[in-house]
Amino acid sequence: MSDIFRFDTEEQTLTKEKIKLKKPSKYRVIILNDDFTPMEFVVWILQMVFHRSRAESQQIMLKAHITGKALCGVYSHDVARTKVAQVQQLAEQHGYPLHCTMEVEEGEEES
């Protein structure tokens, strides 16, 4: 909480108000499966963009392959948006249709 002090010059009183700060929302970055992007490329993306170990990357890739999507990580809005853009850019550069999305973490409200 932050304190704000106001001074009213007409009445010459000092008032202290409490302001409750809201935590910023967190966003889930989800990788989506497709039938064209090689599994090794997905593993490489997870290592490069999301800084996952090879074993973690393989687990995430397999989950996306089996269920159609998988969680890459939970980040602030700007970081999540940047990671989605990085995946898009790398996939396009290599000629693959790989996609990522971002969604607000459950229990969080978008501001």
Curated annotation (Swiss-Prot):
One of its GO terms (biological process) is proteolysis. Pfam families: ClpS. SUPFAM superfamilies: ClpS-like. Binds to the N-terminal domain of the chaperone ClpA. Involved in the modulation of the specificity of the ClpAP-mediated ATP-dependent protein degradation. NCBIfam families: PRK00033.1-5. Belongs to the ClpS family. This is ATP-dependent Clp protease adapter protein ClpS. It comes from Leptospira interrogans serogroup Icterohaemorrhagiae serovar Lai (strain 56601). The gene is clpS.
